[in-house]
Amino acid sequence: MQTRKTFSWIKEQITRSISASLMIYIITRTSISSAYPIFAQQGYENPREATGRIVCANCHLANKPVDIEVPQAVLPDTVFEAVVRIPYDMQLKQVLANGKKGALNVGAVLILPEGFELAPVDRISPEMKERIGNLSFQSYRPTKKNILVIGPVPGQKYSEITFPILSPDPATKKDVHFLKYPIYVGGNRGRGQIYPDGSKSNNTVYNATAAGIVGKIIRKEKGGYEITITDASDGRQVVDIIPPGPELLVSEGESIKFDQPLTSNPNVGGFGQGDAEIVLQDPLRVQGLLFFLASVILAQIFLVLKKKQFEKVQLSEMNF
């Protein structure tokens, strides 16, 4: 009887341990997967500052190009494409968080005018779905459906990102008007150099925090270095920690200055931003334009016919 109780207790403890481990794994995985792509969402209410600068540039310090292509004009309640291109050399490899080299990822933020939003799945054509691929877009905030974010996604497959956009209808949204609107875009390739809390990633250059002589360089077991810098005047020692990834540029016994680079800059990526304009066109205006063009064409035709008729009359009078 005692043995059965003991076995039951052990079984219960094992079940609890497995359940706890599973819960920790799920929570950790969810936290990482949801937080990793969109650092900006955690610290900024709006991704575009009053100066026009997109906040992604605070972490991705290198300046790189980005391009956006949208139609010149769209009709109300219409699905259209906003194509964002993030060009880079596909042969490049970036430093990963563990210090190893890997392929670059890309990400983008698209800031649309108020009223414009991500198109519903049932409104997207099969051809557009094929161009979109397996991308999953999300709003920057539940209340900001006009700001869309994506990433990180594999750069080799998605250096060109197609956003399916639904234009608003002023007939149902009174705060939307038939006007020309700006669209802003930001796109990055590769990892950032600074985390949202201000700390450095391993994808940037590390500088000396003091001047002096490099006394000792210890290579860590998991990668990276501990560099001891000794001040020549008072013997004070400072230890600079270098994470795995950047290549060391100094050696023991070398004299260095304050803020001198201790490592190379491994960053091969960067961030860029751009803008475009789109006109929300009034269908009545389009119909009016078509009517005007048709009137001009008909007037030209009647003018030609009248001219030919006049020439025939003149010719008959001359023959008479």
Swiss-Prot record:
Membrane topology according to the record: Single-pass membrane protein
Record's keyword terms, sorted: Chloroplast, Electron transport, Heme, Iron, Membrane, Metal-binding, Photosynthesis, Plastid, Signal, Thylakoid, Transmembrane, Transmembrane helix, Transport
UniProt record, GO biological process: photosynthesis
One GO cellular component term: chloroplast thylakoid membrane
Cofactor section: heme
Signal peptide: 1-35
Disulfide bridges in this chain: none
Transmembrane segments: 286-306
Binding positions for heme per the UniProt entry: Y36, C56, C59, H60
Keyword Secreted among record annotations: no
MF terms (GO), sorted A to Z: electron transfer activity; heme binding; iron ion binding
Compartmental location: Plastid, Chloroplast thylakoid membrane
Cofactor comment text: Binds 1 heme group covalently.
Cross-referenced InterPro entries: Cyt-f_TM, Cyt_f, Cyt_f_lg_dom, Cyt_f_lg_dom_sf, Rudment_hybrid_motif
Similarity comment text for this entry: Belongs to the cytochrome f family.
Function (record text): Component of the cytochrome b6-f complex, which mediates electron transfer between photosystem II (PSII) and photosystem I (PSI), cyclic electron flow around PSI, and state transitions.
Subunit structure: The 4 large subunits of the cytochrome b6-f complex are cytochrome b6, subunit IV (17 kDa polypeptide, petD), cytochrome f and the Rieske protein, while the 4 small subunits are PetG, PetL, PetM and PetN. The complex functions as a dimer.
PANTHER family for this protein: CYTOCHROME F (PTHR33288:SF10), PTHR33288
HAMAP family the UniProt entry points to: Cytb6_f_cytF (MF_00610)
Name this polypeptide is given: Cytochrome f
